[in-house]
Structure formats: C-alpha cells, structure tokens
A protein has these predicted regions:
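Anionic-ligand binding patches
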Residues: 10-12, 18-223
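N-terminal amphipathic/basic-hydrophobic helices that include classical n-h-c signal peptides
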Residues: 1-8, 222
Length: 223
C-alpha cells in the first residue's frame, strides 16, 4: 500500500496444475494482489525441471518465467522424501515410475519399495522461490513430516496424498478436508513463510527487491 492506497500487483504462479494454483490462491491472499497461472500468459515455455534439488528447480522455474513475462513470479518445487529410501523419490517425485508422470504408477512403485520396510518415516518438502521481473530470486522452505501407509486411503488431494499421514494426525492428506490440509501441508508452511517474508514486496508494485547495501569484494580482488 502506498499512502493508504492498495497498489494492484500481478503475481504469476509458475504452474499449469489447477490443483496447485487453487491451493496457492487459497493461501496467498493480499489486498490488491492478482494471482494468475502460467496459462494466462501466452507463449510461456514449459521449464525442464532438471535440477538436483528442490531449490534449484524452484529458482529455475521462477526466474525463467519472470524474465519472459516481465512480472513477479512465484514457483514451487516439492516432493516426497522417504527416510528408508535415502530421500527418494525426492526431486523425481512426479516421475518416480518414469515418463509420462503417472500418479497411480508412482504410488504403486512406492508401496513395492517399502513392502517389507517397518520404518516408514517420510516428509513432504516444498521450496518456494519468488523472482523479481529482472530475474533475481529468493527462496523459503516448508516441511511436513509424517509416515507412509501400507495402502492408499482417501480420494481428495493429488500425488502421494493418499499414501501420507502427517505427524500428529490419523487421516491421510487425501482423507482431509482441503481447509485442514491447507493449514498443515508442506506447501502451506512454505507459503505461510513466504507471505511473512515477502509481504512488503508483494504489497506494492515494486520493480525489484529492496536494495541491501553490503559492499562485497570480488573473490579475485581479495587478499
């Protein structure tokens, strides 16, 4: 807000996934903020998520689309990390069973991988990246710990939701009402942190991040 007026601001969400867009819209509520998905802009590329971490993928998506659309852009990369599988499926969560992405095949593969495993601790991780129109990005992270079930439960949600019960609850993500899931999920936690961290930037129509004046010598000039 400037002088008490709400400045309209457009925020591009780097996704064509209607579930994800709806979840972000429900959480990211600020006066004057208009949220649009990638389909609302013509000619935006599909960004190849080839990073080795959620952080790398989130930043790549946010920066690529921000530069193309010349608009503040929010991207997330998220997935499931299973302790007994050394963090798999991790960044491969959407394509765990191969191409094209297939939720049923992914869930079936996960059940097979954990068939004889008693220790079923897991966590959903979400990294949210926000890029300025000029391509400078910052990130925040949200984590939801829980465990993997021995069978699918529930029909709500998407992805691995029917397989995952968050710590402190008896219902799987796919059995929960959206209102509850949108309070405790990894994406909810990351977006809540994003709101707290970036509220001032998103409340105005800034062209870039506020300047942080820290003089830094180039590495080759030191010593």
């Amino acid at each position: 807000a400037v002088n008490g007026l709400v400045v309209p601001m457009k925020l591009l969400i780097a996704t064509r996934n209607p579930h994800k867009l709806a979840e972000i819209r429900a959480l990211f509520v600020l006066p004057g903020l208009t949220i649009v998905g990638a389909d609302a802009f013509g000619g935006l590329p599909d960004v190849v998520e080839d990073g080795s971490s959620f952080q790398a993928n989130g930043v790549k998506k946010a920066v690529t689309l921000a530069l193309r659309a010349r608009c503040w852009t929010l991207a997330d990369d998220s997935g499931l990390e299973v302790e007994a599988l050394n963090g798999e499926p991790g960044v491969q969560s959407a394509r765990y069973a191969g191409e094209p992405p297939d939720t049923s095949a992914n869930n079936a593969k996960l059940l097979r991988a954990l068939e004889s495993v008693e220790q079923r601790a897991a966590r959903f991780v979400c990294v949210v990246a926000l890029s300025s129109p000029g391509g400078r990005a910052q990130i925040v992270e949200g984590v939801c710990p829980g465990r993997i079930l021995r069978e699918s439960r529930g029909t709500k949600g998407f992805g691995y939701d029917p397989m995952f019960v968050p710590d402190g609850y008896r219902l799987s993500f796919a059995e929960m009402d959206a209102a509850l899931k949108n309070t405790i999920s990894h994406r909810a936690r990351a977006l809540q942190r994003a709101l707290r961290t970036w509220r001032d930037v998103l409340a105005g129509d800034a062209a870039d991040w506020p300047a942080i004046r820290k003089p830094r010598l180039p590495a080759e000039a030191e010593g």
